[in-house]
Amino acid sequence: MAKKGHIHMESGEIINFELFPNEAPNTAANFEELANSGFYNDVTFHRVIPGFVSQGGDPTGTGAGGSGKTIKCETEGNPHKHQAGSLSMAHAGKDTGSSQFFIVHDPQPHLDGVHTVFGQVDKAGVEIARAMKNGDKMTKVHVFDEE
C-alpha cells in the first residue's frame, strides 16, 4: 500500500506526492501526523530559492519554528537522492528535524546523506514549486493510503 498525499496551495494549485515509509519510516510518519492533524494548514513556504528549493512547514514563517518535537535523520541506507521533486526534511543540524521540509527544484547532490529524503512530488508539482515565491501559502496538506 502506497502513502500518497496532496499539498493544497492558496492559489488553488495542488502538489501531489508519494511518501517513502520503507526508506524513511519515522520521517514519513512524522510528516503524515503533522499533515493530517492540520499542522501545515495556512503555513507558508518561507524560503524559496530559485533553482534550489522551496521550504515550508514553519508555523512562525521565519525559518526558526517547528512542531516542538525533533526526529532523527534517516539518511543511512536511504537510497533516495536529492533530485528534482524530492521531499526532504529540513534541520538545523543532525537529528534536529521537526516540521520544516523542502521540495527540491533541481538536483542537489551536496544534500545527499545530510538531509532525509522522505518523498517525491510529481512533475507538475515540481513546476509549482519552481514557480513559488516567498510567502506562498499551503491551505491544507493531507496524506492517505492508496492501494
Located regions from the model:
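Cyclophilin-like peptidyl-prolyl cis-trans isomerases
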Residues: 1-147
